[in-house]
Amino acid sequence: LVWTVVPALFLAVIIIFGLRVWNDITTPASAEALKVELYAKQFDWTARYPGADGALGATDFRLINDGNPLGIVTRESVAMRLGELKAEIDAMDSTMHHGILPDVKVNELEARIAKLERTSARIVNLRTMMEQDIAEKGEASPYTHGADDVVIKEFHLPLRMEADIMVRSRDVIHSAYLPHMRAQMNAVPGMTTRIKMTPTISTDSMRTVTKNEAFDFILLCNKICGASHYNMQMPLVVESPADYKAWYAEAMKKPFQPSALPLAPAPAVSDSTVVAADTTAAMKVDTTATASLKN
């Protein structure tokens, strides 16, 4: 009986303790926790912090471009992306009608135009859904929170304050790995994963303990994500709440603002010239989602 009861009690203690720790790790962060997003792509990290409204805005991969690398959804970013797509379509359509092209090239351009038109239609649907959601929920709609988000290549956390870290990926599976924090979470395209953590020692304190003035906590990618995988690292600064507040106030001076790519001049066309489509052409549009293209 002893050989049965003692191991059973021992295992029960281990299991109960393990379940408590597991629940502490996996339960959602508190409502007061700092919200921050880590965005992975080949081959770097980007951080996003909420603006004055304290909430992160909605995102959509179809809005991603050089001016909006995280695909943040706002009325302006939707309008600008539609303008860019229209400019690309018009440029390729002009090439098809004014250039002398082989059939293979014409077929390629037609397929590309069809794809861009499908993307444009989906973004129009997104705009409709956004307007309906804003009309129903008002300021509670996630589509109203993106304009003041802070998109930055720095990662800061306040000391002894809970952080709710959302992790996303643009392209392949990455892994947000904070070795000093013993924390890791996969970054999976198409979904958002989360890490809940509370830093308990600051960067300055670690520099004192390690006697290394150059010490930094580090964010790494723990998946072999491509040829330049080694570039996926970003320092993490853990600082006092006062220092964090000062840094955050400075960062908020440069909120996210979607910017259109510059519209490249149309190439000259002659009877003997094959004109390549400029797939990076873009245009400026107004905030009412009305695009205009100057010929």
Enumerate the predicted regions with their spans:
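Non-transmembrane, membrane-proximal soluble domains of secreted or membrane proteins
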Residues: 1-295
